[in-house]
Amino acid sequence: MSSEHIQNKLALLPDQPGCYLMKDRQGTIIYVGKAKVLKNRVRSYFSGTHDSKTQRLVQEIVDFEYIVTSSNVEALLLEINLIKKHDPRFNIRLKDDKTYPFIKITNERHPRLIITRQVKKDKGKYFGPYPNVYAANEVKRILDRLYPLRKCSTLPNKVCLYYHLGQCLAPCVFDVEASKYKEMQDEIVAFLNGGYKTVKNDLMKKMQEAAENMEFEKAGEFRDQINAIETTMEKQKMTMNDFVDRDVFGYAIDKGWMCVQVFFIRQGKLIERDVSQFPFYNDADEDFLTFIGQFYQKANHIPPKEIYLPDDVDSEAVQAVVPDTKIIVPQRGNKKELVKLAYKNAKIALNEKFMLLERNEERTVGAVERLGEAMGIPTPSRVEAFDNSNIHGTDPVSAMVTFLDGKPSKNDYRKYKIKTVEGPDDYATMREVIRRRYWRVLKEGLPMPDLILIDGGKGQIDSAKDVLTNELGLDIPVAGLAKDDKHRTSQLLFGDPLEIVPLERNSQEFYLLQRMQDEVHRFAITFHRQLRSKTGFQSILDGIPGVGPGRKKKLLKHFGSMKKLKEASVEEIKEAGVPLNVAEEVHKHITAFNEKAKNTEQK
């Protein structure tokens, strides 16, 4: 990644705690770190002088990403999970085989309170993890003084010092009722789950009394215990005190784009996250449901035991997509905070996307020249980019945006309602739009572009070139922008025969193309949404006898997505709770629609 782009990303770092992941040229995570203030810590790598070890790391960094947390403690706990997950080579010397400590109440006849680094399914009660052994021991010391559980690993023949200090009930000598242990365990659980505040208040009173009595050493001990409680009892939303596998979803929307963040919690720990950004076409909640349906179709996305969702999501529809998973819409507590944190990270990522685009807008003149050189054409000072937008062929539209010297010229943007094409025929749509646009350019003597960019591949490019050359007699370079499976700009296609133009993905030229494609896509989507709001969205279920709004909603809820409904048999449609004759009509209608779309695509 270019130094300039790194600087742009550094300028957008938040004043919040979190973890950062440094990547090399291959996109491999080479170092994971934590920070109380992400902005200050990450920037420090790219300024000032460093020792030789740090300098070697910095020389290999070409990109970075970060995860915002709610506290420094969470950043600390998340860091260890990320290091275990990615095993970055620059972290290896700092890593050992130990994990973070937990406080455990053992499942024994005479239970003990111990510190352990291994969490087992042994019916013991575990609390943590804690940032370090010192902090865990400080809390245990407080608990030992408050709750006299046994301290010895094996019972001695006589009472020990702990009994005389009032910190053990001496089960080695006396018969201690199970109910007494149960009472102490309940109080310890309450303490470690928030009741520590009452204990802290009692300690503060004792500290004040000791100070008033000139017992400063004793007051200092109380002070240290209070500080230990405050630093270690902070809520830890990034880790759950169980072994349940969960996926936590949050999403944010802006300018026709959606960002979805998924936190993968495995064995109770946040170990990874997925970030997806894409334009959305329908209502945000509907497209989010579609995303979830597609998400769990991927081989490496196995549905977990639980899924946490935001408030405005149709949980019943999600349940239909992953029937064996428990769907939860948290209303309070740590689970709710996790969903909020996923949303917070999605919003930050989306804002960063647009801010980076705006900052790059000021630095594109050189990129325009280098783009022309890479393509073997004169500098494309005027670029006109096209994109088509429709849903199942309804209300098809196209849009054109113009970039002058690498900057958008919004006065030259154009919108087109498709007039001559029926159904989802992208090639015919492209032919119509190119014909209308450049016939008008010729007629009115408007400026000709130096380059035409098409959102698509060979079929769309050939359609545009055929109209320009054979119908209008124009010789304008036409290139295509292909996308990957995450709807991100992937490659530039140009030439005869078509070839991939070799551009570095982290070059300014590539960012310029990405911005052009994003902008024309946004413009087309916005126009399409405005048009649909006036005419009403015509679903492929509209017009089917016996399928009104209620049954339409029932079908979509049952199948989770239009894609699954399209693949359903008559019997499967009937299982959604509709009569057989209606199921047959739906199947007949969808089959005809699919066949029409298939024939159009083959043409």
Swiss-Prot record:
Q: Give one GO biological process term.
A: SOS response
Q: Pfam families attached here?
A: GIY-YIG (PF01541), HHH_2 (PF12826), UVR (PF02151), UvrC_RNaseH (PF22920), UvrC_RNaseH_dom (PF08459)
The GIY-YIG domain covers which part of the protein? 15-92
Per UniProt, subcellular location reads as: Cytoplasm
Domain named UVR: residues: 197-232
The record's listing under InterPro entries reads: DisA/LigA_HHH, GIY-YIG_endonuc, GIY-YIG_endonuc_sf, GIY-YIG_UvrC_Cho, RuvA_2-like, UVR_dom, UVR_dom_sf, UvrABC_protein_C
How the protein assembles, per its UniProt entry?
Interacts with UvrB in an incision complex.
Per the entry, what this protein does is:
The UvrABC repair system catalyzes the recognition and processing of DNA lesions. UvrC both incises the 5' and 3' sides of the lesion. The N-terminal half is responsible for the 3' incision and the C-terminal half is responsible for the 5' incision.
Instruction: Give the family from UniProt.
Output: Belongs to the UvrC family.
Descriptive protein name: UvrABC system protein C
> Which species?
Listeria innocua serovar 6a (strain ATCC BAA-680 / CLIP 11262)
What does the record give as the organism's lineage? Bacteria, Bacillati, Bacillota, Bacilli, Bacillales
